[in-house]
């Protein structure tokens, strides 16, 4: 729905505060005089499983249901126009006609790929259509839910779903739901008719009694959540009369269950508190929401025997929610006899430091492996360096917990949001022919199937589907399409178009995927055997690792080559004098030398697998271990590592204790470098003991252990506490030289308040020509004296300034002027003729980096001649893009030659529209 911008209705509130550091996940216990619990024995730690839950799955992701049953006509359950039903098979943004019965009929087709688990896009009842005019779109994707208890009538009934699950189970396939906890359909509106995001710092939540509070202080569920009413929110929520009871369960109809802060800007705080293009963003810090979502999905576990969940928009929900929700769902599933219940989350980031905490702290079993996807595309499609793959796998230790590790990561090459692997191949090599693209596609599949993780086939990729881009352009139906935008899409390995159904089991990619699945099934080490890196070319070329079966001691050498030539590489294996015979991609036989090295040749854009003729030799020397603790005083996610000598196929189990609390198993590392992570609370009291233990176990079952500990030192500068921000209009400082602004000293001066400058509230800088600051006032305050000073303590003006807060809670001041202005001044009009993009690189090197622009750019660029920065500033490079008259969006890509800063197209829009959320 096109958003109409509204002006915020703001209460006058004098109390103003500053946000400090946030609390971490689990508060540690301070050291006591009592004897702390003894560490677990070596034998107990040695029994810790090296693998957990699902590590040998192969997923098939169905977004639009696979088959349209009967003739091309609307489902019988729907009546009305396309804007009422959402059904229009000629429009890619509407329902096309597939349903659960059609998917059930195609189970054998799915099984033929080697599939062990079906992941279905959300099938719960949705709001059929959102938006108007050209912005109208249907909820065919399933992410605009109104009823979390019923199957959407476009897809069928709850009975149809039970039948599908039953038949899939009978064929040996699991079924996973795609679930949402972040938001619901767009039902809640705001009285102000304004949708810009309002931050917590400027507009804190208020209790029913009008006191500001920070909801994050209550998110862990340990404290009673404050009582609130309709006046507690930055935006005043309202629900149309006709929709007051639309949502199911009924608690979802309470507007107080939502954040009510306006539309997300997709960055910073708004990424977790803002509405995604108007979708109602649930207040997941509330215990009612946590408990409500637990009950919703527990019902599906119990009544439908579902095998697991793919969880949408995980990084847009607070971490405390996941810790509680995932723990509760795991416990409930186990209670129902489902010890292998598996949950993986969508954390849309190629940075392992962003994705991994949702496993280690959020307690999910896995995440969708966006870092792998990014590196796999760079290697297989763009001919990038093997070192990028090495870096991704080198971070695998970050996912290790007592119940999970990177072998459970869910790997993929493309999806319903970013686009298909076939699309990326065509984008990365626009002049390439079908044969070359098909070869690169095969290489990408080999990389995904032969490396650690659970691979996902996005429906249609096995038939060579491509597409014009992501989102709607990546959601073609498998049955014959009537959508014009799909009919001209190429399909790799065939001359077929989307005017025909695509269920060809003889298609080249279908046959390749099926063969790779058989290879993994016959050789389980290729699915979840120990993965040890052996070689990574610095540039295009060979990437190699070993996959070793810890039970049989059999080693497999796996090598890939993304170059157009046929190079060779020499690297170590686990055995000296061992013969390795070609198993896949080659008939060659190689033998390792006395130094355990082999030389392997890999054909152009291909992969090979060689299998050892015998077991690894029994270890001669017993293992020894040396443990390395995090630096004293380190907080947050810290690393614990161990050096191991001797043994063979060693694995190291780590455990930690904070204060006098229980010992916790941190997880198992099954190859060097042996590392795990530990979360240390930022508020750990000084003097708290941090104790660590690690046990190494070799292939013969022999063990050795190491222990160490240290005391947490006092924090320099004292402790910080998260404080609530203000609600109301701030003191505004209109400045000609914002960079010179320093702290603002506010409040009635008292002789004993000899504050340091660093403790004064700094000015925040939200927009053009203004900055603002807040400070909490005493109850009953009537006047506020303040100074504006720079970093050296120099005053902005000689005289003290005073605000009469009984008259106003908002004033404007200008540099060098003593006068306070109580009426909002005129601000310079925004320049609508150009877009300004600020780009920052960690290395600070912008040589060769340019901006490719299209869409509403006045002068779209050629890829070979990108727009150059007009200047650099303390943040980074600055690009200025002239826009067309009335411009509403700009598409862009930052790149250096063929190296892209991000793998997918980026876009800016002047106003959000009601397309599906970023999930």
From Swiss-Prot:
Biological process according to GO: carbohydrate metabolic process
Annotated catalytic residues: 312, 346
UniProt feature, compositional bias: Basic residues: 707-724
Catalytic activity of the protein: Endohydrolysis of (1->4)-alpha-D-glucosidic linkages in polysaccharides containing three or more (1->4)-alpha-linked D-glucose units
Signal peptide (UniProt feature, chain positions): 1-33
Main location: secreted
Residues binding Ca(2+): 182, 281, 316
Pfam families per UniProt: Alpha-amylase, Alpha-amylase_C, PUD
Cofactor: Ca(2+)
Region feature Disordered, mapped onto this chain: 704-729
GO CC terms: extracellular region
Annotated localization: Secreted
SUPFAM superfamilies in the record: (Trans)glycosidases (SSF51445), Glycosyl hydrolase domain (SSF51011), Starch-binding domain-like (SSF49452)
InterPro entries assigned to the protein according to its UniProt record, in alphabetical order: A-amylase/branching_C, Carb-bd-like_fold, CBM41_pullulanase, Glyco_hydro_13_cat_dom, Glyco_hydro_b, Glycoside_hydrolase_SF, Ig-like_fold
Cofactor note: Binds 1 Ca(2+) ion per subunit.
Gene3D superfamilies tied to this protein: 2.60.40.1110, Glycosidases (3.20.20.80), Golgi alpha-mannosidase II (2.60.40.1180), Immunoglobulins (2.60.40.10)
Keywords: Calcium, Carbohydrate metabolism, Glycosidase, Hydrolase, Metal-binding, Secreted, Signal
Family designation: Belongs to the glycosyl hydrolase 13 family.
Name the UniProt record assigns to this protein: Alpha-amylase
